[in-house]
Amino acid sequence: MSTFEKEPSSPDPKFYVAGVDVGQKQDHSAVAVVDKIDRRFALIHLKQFQLGTEYGSVIGYLKLLNENLHDLRRIMIDQTGVGETFMSMAINSGLKNARGIELSQPKKQDVMTFLKHCMEDGLVHIPYDREFMNELNVERFELLETGRLKFSHPPGTHDDRLWAFALAIYYARLEPTEYHPVAAVNTRPSPGNLFPQLPRSIWKR
């Protein structure tokens, strides 16, 4: 899912949103693009950069997305920590549809909870990707004394693509839609895991 082609012209406008999770030495930078159709979200593009990839290369990739993907309405960037520098570079580079979001603990809970509910309601469609499926399955949460959830992943794993995907869906929710009910899946997750044992029905081959 790391390649894309120029989208052919279409009379029907699309609603594409990209999510960007910024990393560098210990974490990967990642980009996810979703297509919003009614109340459903389809993952159409997913890219994980190598560790240590320069921010300029990631921004160049986003500019290429803008040029080749019509109707990319918004690029949502996690500007927490190192993301602040990246966000400034993105704006200075001319990415006019880029916006930053501070992922505080409450906001992280909002973003990830929304994704979880969408997946439980069968509103999310993802091309089959074993590594990304594992990334979803191992994400953990812990209830803090404050009543908030803390998210983490086991040592040796990453959740960069997951957060990029979650950010894209979180912004795409703002587009007005018509409701079309679909089957619900995995409505009772096991304690401690956010998306345990995801059914194969959400993965497109």
Describe each PLM feature range.
Residues 1-105, 109, 113, 126-205:
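RNase H-like, metal-dependent nuclease domains and their acidic two-metal-ion catalytic environment used
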Residues 111-121:
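Short, surface-exposed amphipathic charged segments that create phosphate/polyanion-binding patches used
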